[in-house]
Amino acid sequence: LSIRRQRQMCIRDSRKGSFTGFDSLSYKGYNMYYKDKMFLRPKLLVDFNRIRPGEFYSERDVQNTYSALGRLRMLKYSNIRFKEVNVSDSTKLDAYIVLSKGQNKSVSFEIEGTNSAGDLGAAASISFQHRNVFKGSETFTMKVRGAYEAITGLGQDYVNDNYTEYGVESSLNFPEFMFPFLSSDFKRKIKATSEVGLKFTSQVRPEFSRMLASASWSYRWSDRKHIQHRLDLADINYVYMPSKSPDFQEYLDKMTANNSLLRASYENVLIVRMGYNFTYNSAGNTMMRTPTKSSYSLRVNVEEAGNLMYAASKLAHSTPKGDKGFVLANIPFAQYIKGDFDFAKNFMIDPRNSFVFHIGVGVAYPYGNSRALPFEKRYFSGGANSVRGWSVRSLGPGGYKGSSDGQMDFIKQSGDIKLDLNVEYRTHLFWKLNGAAFIDAGNIWTIRSDSEQEDGVFKFNKFYKQIAVAYGLGIRFDLDYLILRFDGGMKAINPMETGKGRYPITRPRFSRDFAFHFAVGY
C-alpha cells in the first residue's frame, strides 16, 4: 500500500515505474494504491500520517510518522521515501509511504514465573489474537490462564498453603483515543490507545475461595516524551466469596463478636471505580535494565469508588440494609478514595557505581457505604518490594504485636496507610553480576481503631516511632531483557517489640531477624 502526499496525486511505484495491476481510491485528496483489497481504513492512514503536503520537509514529521505507524499492530513494517518531482525543479519532493501487511491472527502459549510480593509461583496461558478486527488495526485478545503460587506467612493452621487461579479474559484495543467530540488534530498530537476488557477469575486460597468478574474501559496516552497517562474511565468489579475454610470462618465469626472492621474486607462486594495514573521517567523504562545515567521517576495514582452509586441511592431514597449499607441487586458496593505517590532517584557516581533513593506513600479511606476497604485494595508491608527485613505481609500495622498464638496474623497485618523508604548503593561486580547494600524503612497503619489490630491506628504523635528499619545485601543478575534480584535483609528496628528487643541491630540473631527475597526487576 503506497500513499503519496502531493497536490497532483499522481503516484508511481518506485520499483516498477507504475502502479499497473493495483487498485486505487482517493480519500480527502490522497490517492491510495493497493492489491486485492484495502486492509486498513483510509481515514486511519490519513490520521496516522504526520507529513503534510505543501509544507517544508521536516525530519521530525518523518520520525513522528514512523512512530505513529509503528503503533499499528497490523503493520509488519513501514518505509518512507522521497523523490524529486522533476530534475528541473529540485525544490519539490514526492513522499512515498509503503506499508507492509503483517500477520493478523496468531495463537500463543506462555509459561511464566510469578512473584507476588515475594510469594513465588508459576503460570501458563494460551491466547488468541486478531490484530485487525474492524480494519483499523484494532487488537482483539482472548486468553485462558492458570496459575499456582506458594503462599508464605499463613501460620501453622493450614496444611495446604497453595494458591491456585484460573481465569479467562478478553480485550479489544483501539490504537487511538476513542472518545466523542475529539478533533482529528487533537488525536494526532498524542499517542493514545483505548481498551475495553472483560475478565473472570476463580481463586482458591487456603483460607477462602473467591470469584472475580470485571468489565473495564480505559485510555492510555502520551503527549510528551517520558510522560505516560492512564485513565480508567469505568472499572466494574464484582467480588464473590462462595466458600471459606472452617478455621477462617470461625475466625471471622469471632471478629464479628468483637465488632471488627476487618470482617468487612472478606464479604461479597461490588466495586465501581474510576482512576487516573500519571508516570514520568526521565530515562524511559528502566524496570528491566540497569540504568546507565542519573535519572528519576515519578508515579501518582488516584482512584475513587462508589460515589456515583451512593449519590444515586440517596436521590432514590433507598433504604440501607443494616451493616451492608446501600445495595444494588442485594450486593453491597464499596465506597472509598485512594491515592498513591512513588518517587525514585538514581544518582550515577561512575559507570560502575550508583546510589538510589526511593519513597512510596499510599493512603486509602473507606467511607459512606463502606466500613473497611475491600481485601484487594488494602496495603501490606514486608517482602521484596517493601521493608526487606520482614517476609511478605508480616509487618504492621503500626506497633501491632500479633496474636498470642500467631494464628491468622496475615489477616490482621493489613492497613489503610503505607509508607516505604529505601536507600540503596549498587555496584557492578563482574560479568552480569551486580551487588547492592540497602537500608529500608516503613510500615502500614489503619485509619480507624480496631480491637483486632491493637496499636495499629495512625497517629501523628506516634507513627514515626513505629517505623520499622532493615538493612541488608543483595545480588542482581542483569540478563539484558530482565533482572533477577536476590536480597537478604536483617531487622534493625522492630516496632512490634519493646525494650531491648525493639533494636535487634544491637544484638542481631540470624534465625530471628533474617528474611530472604527473590524478585524480578528493580
Region roles according to the model:
Residues 38-39, 58-299, 388-389, 395, ...:
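Gram-negative/organellar outer-membrane beta-barrel architecture
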Residues 311, 408, 450-468, 499-509, ...:
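Outer-membrane beta-barrel domain signature, especially the mid-to-C-terminal portions
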Residues 43-51, 256-257:
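Acidic/histidine-rich, surface-exposed loop or edge segments in extracytoplasmic proteins
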Residues 2-7, 11:
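Single conserved hydrophobic/aromatic residue that forms the stacking wall/gate
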Residues 52-56, 130, 458-459, 471, ...:
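C-terminal soluble interaction/assembly domains
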Residues 29-35, 49-56, 157-158, 330:
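Second-shell loop/turn segments in exported
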Residues 17-21, 30-35, 114-117, 230-427, ...:
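C-terminal outer-membrane beta-barrel translocator/porin domains of Gram-negative envelope proteins
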